[in-house]
């Protein structure tokens, strides 16, 4: 199984120190828009596509042949790294199509957007080799309309430039920004050369129920919350086990209290995506009962899909 390179969280203090250290000796950052698709590794020897979990994607046959042809243009390289994506579709639509087992011809709208590849060179060189090969595909391939694209990449000189470009990516409908440092080869692990930058929203939702921790009776697993327009969803609070136990013991008294939820965005159905509970707002007449003391950073997205 080929393991992809995974990103660090840009907002963590350790990440900031790593980036500052890099900037002392280097004067170039690379950024790409963060796509909201399905992360895949494409094997250049076989044309096969594999999700991060190692599961093969078998219902996008329109891509397999072109991956093989791409491999012929860059002999000696093992794989390319990207996402199954279409900027006109949201993630739920993409996921539904990629998971389809019937009517797979309908998946031809799914494109392969590539942002990196295997190799011992630094990112700038890997990216150049990849883009040149992709640009040759329409001439090389028998397919007139290729479904493989290179993700737009920008070389920038400062973090101010990076954050300005991040704002542009968000305005253009992307999920965020991938920041790449330019001093290491491709790494099949969570790497200190790759960082994801995302914006978050905090909103309050009414607690209407609860779920016990699976395999750990007596501890809260998640709250069920409502948004006031008919949607309910589960949110796991980012607190210590001790406080999850207290939440479970006090679960009845917490009904109708407000849970502050941090999330990336809402789905087309209006449900927050990747929600994390960060605080409970009690009646203002009462003293705050719990200090959240998260056991995971509330900005940590390392458990999120793909990266």
Q: Which residues make up each language-model segment?
A:
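Short, motif-level signal for alpha-helix interfacial/capping segments enriched in acidic residues
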Residues: 13-20, 93-99, 156-163
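Covalent nucleotidyltransferase
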Residues: 19-143, 306-307
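Short, well-ordered loop/turn elements at secondary-structure boundaries
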Residues: 24-27, 35-38, 108-109, 171-174, ...
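Short, structured patches in soluble enzyme cores that scaffold and shape functional sites
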Residues: 82-84, 114-119, 134, 152-155, ...
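Classical nucleotidyltransferase
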Residues: 32, 38-82, 186-307
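Acidic carboxylate-rich catalytic motifs and surrounding loops in phosphoryl-/glycosyl-chemistry enzymes
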Residues: 145-160, 263-265
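Charged, flexible boundary elements
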Residues: 1-25, 31
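Amphipathic alpha-helical
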Residues: 1, 152-201, 212
């Amino acid at each position: 199984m080929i393991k992809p390179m995974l990103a660090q969280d840009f907002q963590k203090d350790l990440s900031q120190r790593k980036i500052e250290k890099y900037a002392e000796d280097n004067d170039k950052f690379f950024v790409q828009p963060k796509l909201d698709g399905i992360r895949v590794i494409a094997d250049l020897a076989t044309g096969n596509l594999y999700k991060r979990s190692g599961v093969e994607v078998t219902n996008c046959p329109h891509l397999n042949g072109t991956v093989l042809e791409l491999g012929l243009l860059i002999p000696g390289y093992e794989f390319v790294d990207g996402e199954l994506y279409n900027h006109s579709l949201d993630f739920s639509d993409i996921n539904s199509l990629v998971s389809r087992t019937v009517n797979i011809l309908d998946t031809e709208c799914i494109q392969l957007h590539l942002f990196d590849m295997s190799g011992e060179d630094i990112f700038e060189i890997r990216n150049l080799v990849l883009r040149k090969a992709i640009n040759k595909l329409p001439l090389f391939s028998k397919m007139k309309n290729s479904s493989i694209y290179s993700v737009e990449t920008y070389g920038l000189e400062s973090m101010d430039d990076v954050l300005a470009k991040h704002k542009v990516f968000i305005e253009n409908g992307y999920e965020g920004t991938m920041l790449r440092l330019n001093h290491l080869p491709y790494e099949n692990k969570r790497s200190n050369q790759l960082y994801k930058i995302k914006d978050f929203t905090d909103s309050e939702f009414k607690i209407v129920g609860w779920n016990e921790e699976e395999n750990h009776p007596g501890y809260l697993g998640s709250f069920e919350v409502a948004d006031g327009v008919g949607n309910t969803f589960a949110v796991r609070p980012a607190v210590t086990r001790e406080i999850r136990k207290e939440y479970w013991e006090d679960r009845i008294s917490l009904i109708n209290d407000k849970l502050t939820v941090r999330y990336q965005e809402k789905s087309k159905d209006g449900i927050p995506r990747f929600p994390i509970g960060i605080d409970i707002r009690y009646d203002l007449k009462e003293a705050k009962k719990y200090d959240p003391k998260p056991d995971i950073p509330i900005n940590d997205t390392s458990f999120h899909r793909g990266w």
